[in-house]
Amino acid sequence: MNAPAPKPGLVIVDKPAGMTSHDVVSKLRRAFSTRKVGHAGTLDPMATGVLVVGIERGTRFLAHMVASTKAYDATIRLGAATSTDDAEGEVISTTDASGLDHRAILAEIANLTGDIMQKPTKVSAIKIDGKRAHERVRDGEEVDIPARPVTVSVFDVLDYRVDSEFYDLDVRVHCSSGTYIRALARDLGNALQVGGHLTALRRTEVGPFTLNDATPLSKLQENPELSLNLDQALTRSYPVLDITEDEGVDLSMGKWLEPRGLKGVHAAVTPSGKAVALIEEKGKRLATVFVAHPNTL
């Protein structure tokens, strides 16, 4: 007999440094004994911290996960620019930054806060004509990614150190999805005319999920357990709409309900606590956008 499929849900991983996000997925596929594993929001190999991973039907929920905001703790080194905008690339220029005025640094940080246009780093997972930018760079192609709007709501300096010709900043950033912290380091260095790159990055929040929810990968490999089942994942991510058990059955079969004047997506929850689906008003219908518990399962 085949082993039963793992329960669907989310695993919040505290990713270690030195591996790709796909490496984490591969290890969790083995740990949970299923191919149905995927992640939301790529973390670079050098980065650590929150990586949201879906298991079984949880992979389908990832596309609907509210992750409009993310938070990071990072270290920026001013005085050197690299080919990748982080410590893993080759140093392409150096300029003595030890004499920088801290007030000038804070002024340029202020210019990189709020609604800004950001040019993503060339070595990124962004697809250009179906091929990821970092693959094109590796193959020797010239890559030019247009600037895009992002929001940096917090860009705070927690500490700083002057080390020889370098000026290191420990920073905390809260930003919209799609913001590159490496690009912030690069742009800050360019604005100060000394170059800059990222030397450390730890993601502390993805939407409603934080490091407090996260489990080290090594522990998950030893004891593979969900961080949240689908009911918990939906209600943690969206406002709740209470429905009857009968309405839950209808939604589980893909049927729609009468509109109730709702704005935005809600998690439809029955009296028994089952988050049956994500629903949204579309015209004169309250329709499903994701069914967590289909009637066929």
Swiss-Prot record:
Enzyme Commission code: 5.4.99.25
Annotated keywords: Isomerase, tRNA processing
Database matches in CDD domains: PseudoU_synth_EcTruB
A molecular-function term among this protein's GO annotations: tRNA pseudouridine(55) synthase activity
Active-site positions on this chain: 44
Example of a GO biological process term: tRNA pseudouridine synthesis
Lineage: superkingdom: Bacteria
Catalytic activity annotation: uridine(55) in tRNA = pseudouridine(55) in tRNA
Family: Belongs to the pseudouridine synthase TruB family. Type 1 subfamily.
Physiological role: Responsible for synthesis of pseudouridine from uracil-55 in the psi GC loop of transfer RNAs.
Protein name: tRNA pseudouridine synthase B
